[in-house]
């Protein structure tokens, strides 16, 4: 079976980064379109309450994806390091564990979500005006949790063995199916939020079928056969060690969005709808930078496993330069096109007015935001569970959420709007400090190995 050792070990760094990151960035662009589709077509109903309801429910969907990242990012990091250490059998055990782990957890989460639906609706801040729409959307999303988690996990698992293109194809299939079904179910059939949720789940099922077919055709170095399932020998703990911080990062992000929405609800449903649209628009900037940095994680993991610090640092520095250049260009595009971006989703005058201010606020940290994601993915690629966990808790738990309360109390609605960029800059400083420390300890690790 062909592996990607030449790509990981010998290909010039710019080409290796492009080979791994470009398909991942395209996948993230697909995710942007995927996430924008529901809001866009719901917006065509001309009903701000439905837009607000989907915005309120989105963090729950993101939590399901975050739980998929537990196995996806954790598994990808463990697989790339195992391949770097020439332990192919271990990599197969890891992929099989992630397959059945993501499906099993998905079933459990689906059952708990359906049973606790009213509690969830209360926690996300649904008002009397939006709770009905939010309930319709979440009921379908909850049932589809196993498919969301499996497709999220395996989009990352494929990258762990260097199959970024195949990961991209799976994402693309899911998005195309979603975009085709959205206008039919939302507008033609008039199903509103229920139709948006159904289209999303069917798209995830299509992606799952592609990933399963890819493995069953023998195209992969890895395995999803139950005979290769193994939890012992540090496999479950190795996946969880990186997967839990990665998952926790996304869960805290979703929880922070819930807190943000609850703060905005105090100023009416219109700011909630506007922030939902602004954040959807800003996904273009955020997810492309995440795509670049997620794409290089297997390169980091492989070369860390192979003790090749020189190549690891070359990958890190080159990716950092690209992220700043790309972030600056994307920021300028967003500022110039801010009104058009908001009006793409909804043309309500009050929502557009709030939305423009929110888009500009979110761009304040965008040029350097890629550095944060680069540090996070480098730490995860190196398999450093504790530093990854510390950075995760700092970014969302200890910085952003408290800032929402503090700035809301000090500056009102403007404080809530500008909490995100303020938190981003503080998080970037923390991330750089942690990464610098890890690179220094890597020098000591190599000295001990040579001794």
Where are the regions a protein language model picked out?
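Short alpha-helical transmembrane segments in multi-pass integral membrane proteins
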Residues: 1-21, 79-146, 188-244, 300-365, ...
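Residue-level signal for short hydrophobic patches within transmembrane helices
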Residues: 10, 14-33, 37, 60-67, ...
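Transmembrane helical elements of multi-pass membrane transporters/channels
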Residues: 19-38, 140, 174, 203-207, ...
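Helix-terminus/linker motif at the lipid-water interface of multi-pass membrane proteins
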Residues: 29, 33-51, 121-128, 184-191, ...
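Residue-level hotspots within pore-lining transmembrane alpha-helices
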Residues: 30, 34, 64-68, 108, ...
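Alpha-helical transmembrane segments of multipass membrane proteins
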Residues: 36-40, 111, 119, 153-157, ...
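Small-residue-rich hydrophobic transmembrane alpha-helices
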Residues: 51-111, 148-167, 274-332, 336-338, ...
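Short runs within selected transmembrane alpha-helices of multi-pass transporters and secretion channels
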Residues: 141-159, 167-175, 196-209, 290-293, ...
């Amino acid at each position: 079976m062909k592996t990607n050792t030449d790509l990981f070990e010998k290909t010039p760094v710019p080409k290796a980064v492009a080979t791994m990151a470009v398909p991942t960035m395209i996948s993230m662009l697909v995710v942007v379109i995927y996430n924008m589709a529901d809001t866009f077509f719901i917006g065509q109903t001309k009903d701000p309450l439905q837009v607000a309801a989907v915005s309120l429910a989105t963090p729950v969907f993101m939590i399901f994806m975050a739980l998929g990242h537990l196995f996806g990012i954790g598994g990808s990091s463990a697989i790339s390091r195992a391949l770097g250490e020439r332990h192919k059998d271990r990599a197969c055990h890891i992929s099989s564990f992630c397959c059945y782990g993501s499906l099993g957890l998905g079933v459990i989460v689906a059952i708990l979500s359906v049973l606790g639906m009213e509690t969830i609706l209360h926690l996300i801040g649904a008002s009397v005006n939006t709770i009905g729409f939010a309930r319709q959307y979440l009921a379908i999303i909850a049932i589809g949790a196993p498919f969301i988690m499996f497709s999220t996990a395996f989009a990352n698992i494929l990258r762990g063995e260097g199959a970024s293109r195949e990961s991209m194809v799976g994402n693309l299939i899911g998005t195309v199916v979603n975009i085709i079904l959205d206008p039919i179910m939302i507008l033609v059939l008039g199903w509103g939020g229920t139709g948006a949720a159904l289209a999303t789940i069917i798209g995830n099922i299509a992606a799952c079928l592609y990933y399963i077919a890819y493995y069953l055709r023998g195209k992969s170095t890895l395995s999803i056969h139950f005979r290769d399932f193994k939890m012992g020998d540090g496999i479950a703990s190795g996946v969880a060690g990186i997967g839990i911080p990665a998952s926790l990062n996304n869960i805290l992000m979703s929880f922070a969005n819930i807190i943000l929405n609850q703060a905005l609800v105090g100023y009416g449903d219109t700011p909630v709808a506007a922030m939902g649209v602004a954040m959807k628009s800003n996904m273009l900037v955020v997810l492309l930078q995440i795509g670049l940095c997620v794409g290089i994680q297997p390169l980091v993991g492989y070369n860390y496993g192979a003790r090749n610090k020189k190549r690891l640092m070359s990958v890190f520095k080159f990716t950092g330069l690209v992220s700043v250049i790309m972030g600056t260009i994307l920021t300028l595009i967003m500022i110039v096109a801010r009104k058009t971006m908001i009006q793409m989703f909804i043309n309500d005058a009050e929502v557009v007015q709030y939305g423009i201010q929110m888009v500009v606020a979110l761009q304040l940290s965008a040029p350097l935001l890629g550095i944060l994601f680069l540090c996070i993915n480098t730490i995860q690629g190196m398999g450093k569970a504790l530093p990854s966990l510390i950075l995760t808790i700092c970014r969302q738990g200890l910085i952003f959420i408290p800032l929402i309360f503090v700035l809301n109390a000090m500056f009102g609605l403007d404080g809530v709007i500008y909490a995100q960029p303020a938190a981003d800059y503080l998080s970037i400083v923390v991330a750089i400090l942690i990464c610098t420390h890890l690179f220094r300890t890597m020098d000591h690790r190599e000295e001990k190995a040579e001794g």
